[in-house]
Amino acid sequence: MRRAEIERETKETYVKIALNLDGEGSFLGDFPIPYYKHLISTLCFYAGWDVEINAKGDIEVDPHHLIEDTGITLGKAFNSAILKSSFLRFSNKVIPMDEALVMVVVDISGRPYLEIKDDKEILKGRLIKEFLRGFVNNSQMTLHIWILSGENLHHVEEAIFKALGLALGEASKEVSNLKSTKGKIW
């Protein structure tokens, strides 16, 4: 089974995540920031992952620490679980949500890189970037996000998490042979 359990504790946060890549898309647990709980559970639902999370932190100071550390912990769990198999590796998805249209492209490559094309600067200063950066760097994947249109911030961010979930669900599917001209990724 492609599962992992990762725990991260700092002076500012505590995050424990149990991840099953071959799940049903269920999200259990406690995350004290409702909007980000919504986004993370959306990602897991569309990826088909079962995730149990226990997270707490100094959100009265700033939610930044907890959101970033959750991305880091989920990325580490994903990396640990995905290495237990060969997988499709690549995927891309274009998802609308009302006026928002977002394209996500992933390569589970062993090379972390995050590119967000946001010409209108819709995500400027948003903590979603910290979550995604932590996730990408620790999952060791390449992630490109293009915001093609959108005005409502919630619609844009939710479209990103839906597209990312669908793309990761597909890219992480088990296959008999990993596609790499090098013969391996890590």
UniProtKB/Swiss-Prot annotation:
Pfam families: IGPD. The keyword Chloroplast does not apply. Transmembrane segments: none annotated. Signal peptide: none annotated. One of its GO terms (cellular component) is cytoplasm. Keywords: Amino-acid biosynthesis, Cytoplasm, Histidine biosynthesis, Lyase. The keyword Metal-binding does not apply. Pathway: Amino-acid biosynthesis; L-histidine biosynthesis; L-histidine from 5-phospho-alpha-D-ribose 1-diphosphate: step 6/9. GO terms for biological process: L-histidine biosynthetic process. It comes from the Bacteria. It is found in: Cytoplasm. GO terms for molecular function: imidazoleglycerol-phosphate dehydratase activity. Its EC number is 4.2.1.19. It catalyses: D-erythro-1-(imidazol-4-yl)glycerol 3-phosphate = 3-(imidazol-4-yl)-2-oxopropyl phosphate + H2O. SUPFAM superfamilies: Ribosomal protein S5 domain 2-like. Belongs to the imidazoleglycerol-phosphate dehydratase family. NCBIfam families: PRK00951.2-4. This is Imidazoleglycerol-phosphate dehydratase. It comes from Dictyoglomus thermophilum (strain ATCC 35947 / DSM 3960 / H-6-12). The lineage of its organism: Bacteria, Pseudomonadati, Dictyoglomota, Dictyoglomia, Dictyoglomales.
